[in-house]
Curated annotation (Swiss-Prot):
It holds the Pfam family CLP_protease. The keyword tRNA-binding does not apply. It is an enzyme of class 3 (hydrolase). Cleaves peptides in various proteins in a process that requires ATP hydrolysis. Has a chymotrypsin-like activity. Plays a major role in the degradation of misfolded proteins. This is ATP-dependent Clp protease proteolytic subunit. GO terms for molecular function: ATP-dependent peptidase activity; ATPase binding; serine-type endopeptidase activity. Gene3D superfamilies: 2-enoyl-CoA Hydratase, Chain A, domain 1 (3.90.226.10). GO terms for cellular component: cytoplasm; endopeptidase Clp complex. It comes from Aeromonas salmonicida (strain A449). Signal peptide: none annotated.
Amino acid sequence: MYKNYNDVTESPRNALIPMVVEQTAKGERSYDIYSRLLKERVIFLTGQVEDHMANLVVAQLLFLESENPDQDISIYINSPGGAVTAGMSIYDTMQFIKPDVSTVCMGQACSMGAFLLAGGAKGKRFCLPSARVMIHQPLGGFQGQASDIQIHAQEILKIKNTLNERLAFHTGQEMATIERDTDRDNFMSADQAVAYGLVDGILSQRG
């Protein structure tokens, strides 16, 4: 049985997930819609990027690789962003597994969502026509002794540099350009995201 519960902590939304009933040789079998789409190698990355959601996405990526290491996986992204460490666990797994991971932005891909969108397989990263993409530098907040604040500030700068290096690699932009363009919230339309190199094309319809 395929499982894909990205929002199990939100019971009202969970209660409204549609079910799909299929006829099999052994009778009827029902799936929630996300589990049924997982059978088609489709993963949904929606909402805030946090540890619980990231663990589920990573588990699905590893499972689909074990099922067929030679068939592409698609991740549909609609996310405002979230925790860098959670997002990096997804990103590193996308790069680690053998199947190409195609990314598709529907709605929005902001902050870490945009980073994961750009991290898809080259030539297989897409936006839907009305999607919005936003890149910026990592955010951080810490309270404590001055020496501890300094340590955390240095760590944020290291993370910022790592993210910028990876964005430069995936987009083909110069490092200086990435540093300038991520200094503040930088929103892009689907066309602008293509021109920037965050995605490879716009999907208006299948076929």
